[in-house]
A protein has these predicted regions:
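Conserved alpha/beta-hydrolase
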Residues: 162-179
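Short beta-strand/loop motif that positions the catalytic acidic residue
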Residues: 319, 325-327, 331
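Hydrolase active-site cap/lid region
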Residues: 226-305, 326
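Alpha/beta-hydrolase active-site loop
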Residues: 154, 185-205
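N-terminal cap/lid segment of alpha/beta-hydrolase-fold proteins
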Residues: 54, 64, 92-136
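Catalytic histidine neighborhood in serine/cysteine hydrolases
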Residues: 344-364
Length: 404
């Protein structure tokens, strides 16, 4: 890994970028903050200007493609890469511009950080992975993966900062994610212990700390329930019921009746509701299209049925290691009630630590955008505390937060 490549400050030396108001649509505003988080302060005014004039996804796509071209022309390779990724994010799976935007993003990030993925065989395809090692390792090897719409390259500024502090990080994309999906056709599966086992086998790893980001916060609980080589678990953030999170984006009050309709196999009614929601909310249309693409399903009904399998309620009691559960007080994707529900379900975990980030932290939204450096510090300090303080022969349990 290139030591001169940009790092996200994980030490707290510089002020966090913060979470700003760019756009009145809460989901678009979240995505604007997402890309500014990785690019840095130079992106604030550019994104604000674009958000002020763009109200539709096509306008955002064209705007971010323009910013990417301008950034590349000014030798701002990192900004150009993330602007290409932001445009690609808003594109439909069938948009002819999508493959080129994705290729520019991946090529730029891999060049900037001087990394090349290994391909790990899984099922009918391959999963890309990176083994990023420090000069002198501190603590356990960290196994990291993303969620519903992520490329692991997106996290390289954060990962590089953590490697600088002595952490060895093995990060990979599993079925339904990034290049595993786009290049190798692997669609999402709920049995996340299977790709995790393949990665652990490939690198001959034991006694790892697993960090799951976004939807990965639910997948990591699933993996830890069935994979004994995971001894420490970080849900960044919690997501114990993916269906609940998806239903929340479709509309207020639809979760219970929608679940009943799924139980009744009312596909025609559900597809009609999905069409209504997609016409009303751009994020619903994007989520349904992307969801079908990620899961390899053909209809909204089939996609929504697949989300019901991504729940940790029935398997959380199988987790026996130390667990850190993170949440944002203002997360617009994942309701905060999932934090307590997930914590209460981990009845056999050796320890359970929870942390809710608020606006005071500038990290109160999904995955703590605005102050991801605080999360990196928390994860590292928690790993050190659980390794040095907790008696390995006890089953201590605490809900007291670990502070920065």
């Amino acid at each position: 890994m290139d030591a001169s490549a940009p790092r996200l400050d994980c030490t707290g030396t510089t002020p966090p970028i913060g979470y700003r108001q760019y756009h009145p649509d809460v989901s678009i505003n979240f995505q604007c903050n997402r890309w500014v988080q990785w690019i840095g302060p130079s992106a604030v005014d550019e994104v604000a200007e674009l958000a002020a004039r763009a109200d539709t996804y096509p306008e955002l796509i064209d705007g971010f493609l323009g910013l990417a071209q301008r950034a590349r022309g000014a030798d701002r390779a990192l900004a150009g890469a993330y602007y290409d990724r932001s445009a690609e994010f808003f594109m439909s799976a069938t948009d002819p511009r999508r493959p080129a935007a994705r290729t520019r993003f991946l090529t730029a990030l891999r060049t900037i950080y001087d990394v090349t993925p290994e391909l790990i065989a899984f099922g009918s395809g391959f999963m890309p992975a990176y083994d990023l090692r420090p000069e002198r390792q501190i603590g356990p090897t960290i196994l990291m993966f993303g969620g519903f719409d992520s490329y692991v390259e997106e996290f390289l500024p954060m990962i590089a900062g953590m490697v600088d502090t002595g952490r060895r990080i093995v990060v990979f994309e599993g079925p339904g994610q990034g290049s595993a999906l786009e290049d190798h056709g692997l669609t999402m599966i709920p049995e996340w212990e299977q790709p995790v086992a393949a990665v652990l086998d490939h690198y001959r790893l034991e006694d790892v700390a697993a960090v799951g980001i976004s939807l990965g916060g639910g997948l990591v609980i699933r993996a830890a329930a069935f994979e004994p080589r995971i001894s420490q678990v970080v849900a960044f953030d919690i997501l114990d019921d993916f269906f609940e999170a998806v239903a929340r984006q479709i509309g207020r009050g639809v979760r219970i009746p929608l679940r009943a309709l799924l139980t009744a196999h009312a596909s025609r009614i559900i597809n009609g509701i999905a069409g209504w929601a997609a016409a009303r909310k751009p994020v619903s249309e994007w989520g349904l299209q992307q969801g079908m693409h990620v899961t390899g399903t053909a209809t909204p009904y089939e996609f929504l049925r697949s989300t019901t399998a991504m729940s940790t309620g029935k398997i959380s009691h199988l987790v026996r290691g130390d667990v850190l559960l993170l949440a944002g007080a203002d997360d617009h994707y994942v309701p905060l009630r999932q934090l307590r529900r997930q914590a209460d379900a981990l009845v056999n975990a050796r320890s359970v630590t929870t942390r809710v980030f608020t606006a005071v932290d500038q990290a109160s939204n999904h995955c703590q955008l605005g102050n991801i450096g605080a999360v990196s510090r928390l994860i590292e300090s928690w790993l050190d505390v659980t390794a040095s303080v907790l008696d390995r022969d006890t089953a201590a349990r605490t809900s007291a937060p670990v502070h920065r």
